[in-house]
Amino acid sequence: MTDDAVPASGTVHWVGAGLSTGSGLAKLCDTAARVRLWHRTEERAEEALAALGLAGRAEPRAYTRAALAAELAPGDVVVSMLPAPEHGPLLAACVEARAHFACSSYVSDAVLERAPAARAAGVTVLTEAGLDPGIDHLFAHSLIARATAAIGPGTAASYTLTSYCGGVPAVPNDFRYRFSWAPAGVLNALRAPARYIEDGTETTAGRPWRATRPYVVDGETFEAYPNRDSVPFLAQYGLPAGWKPRTFVRGTLRLDGWLTAWAPVFAELERDDDVRIAALAAELAALHPMTEADRDRVVLAVTLDVDAGSGDRWSGRYLLDLTGTAEESAMARCVSRPLALGVTHILDASLPPGLLRAAETPERSESWLRELAEDGVEFALRVEG
């Protein structure tokens, strides 16, 4: 096993050009020696580059796993914008070629299984480096470090940590949501149980929308519900051992009125009829699309409140609230720019080999947040105590 990553070659392979591919790709065209965009066909890759204003700045390629593997060299970086089930085989090809790997998705079991081999080969595996997951991790690490410095790591305390993120229409519609890609993923996420800490107790919401609560951000009311499994992040975020969670939840943010507007959808989800839900996804895509005339909005609020007793309290919150433009959606900006930032740090050899989830350390998180702010991803920090 090596503690040193394979030296970067300077070549970046960006695989896939979906709706989350934005100005992050342009950043890599500025910083990497060579960029190759892999798409379904070479023509589609050329069209995607032209649409992004990057014609001639990256080499178009027709993607198959075999075609990519044939061009991989040691130290190349593969950026996967493909669905998560594709990441395991793609990482396997990277490990074999001793090429680095980066994505914005949660760590899948297939990626986790290959992580030891990647580290042994000197391959960096950067994951969870988009918006959510990604920027949310940076915010959490920064808040925890600040609170620990203020309260003390050895001080007994209780805390509440909430992390809510949502992509919503900038101008609310009656449905309180618009679909920028296939709704099946949104619907199936609502069918998955959510596990989190509430009132100091581990809680599971079998139907996450039933746990929806009002959530106020700077005077604006949203609706928030838990999503996926929050509990593993207790260990991942490394809060002091003497601090006990009152509430710890990572979840989804929606516009006020969403719960009521979606009542007919929830009734369909309750039936657990896969065929009907697939049909419903197609219906919703047609009824509530995000068109070229629409603008999206991304809101990410991460809050930490720590109570050490005797009036000793600390509270901090990061808020990101961005609206898309005609040139780039807010979601594309917030996913592609942190991912590209992570890739630049693979290129400059500042990331170690093995599995990483975004920046992971408080020091690296602070550095990345400074760089993201300089790169146009705006956010605000508020601290009390």
List where the protein language model places each region.
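Rossmann-fold cofactor-recognition segment
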Residues: 53-66
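Conserved N-terminal Rossmann-fold NAD(P)-binding element of oxidoreductases
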Residues: 12-17
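C-terminal catalytic/substrate-binding lobe primarily of soluble NAD(P)-dependent oxidoreductases
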Residues: 3-4, 9, 146-385
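Beta-loop-alpha module in the N-terminal Rossmann-like domain of NAD(P)-dependent dehydrogenases
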Residues: 67, 77-93, 108-109
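Rossmann-fold NAD(P)-binding glycine/threonine-rich loop
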Residues: 105-127
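ADP-ribose/adenylate-binding Rossmann-like module
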Residues: 93-111
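Hydrophobic/small residue at the entry helix of a nucleotide-binding pocket
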Residues: 19-23
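NAD(P)-binding Rossmann-fold cofactor-contacting core
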Residues: 32-49
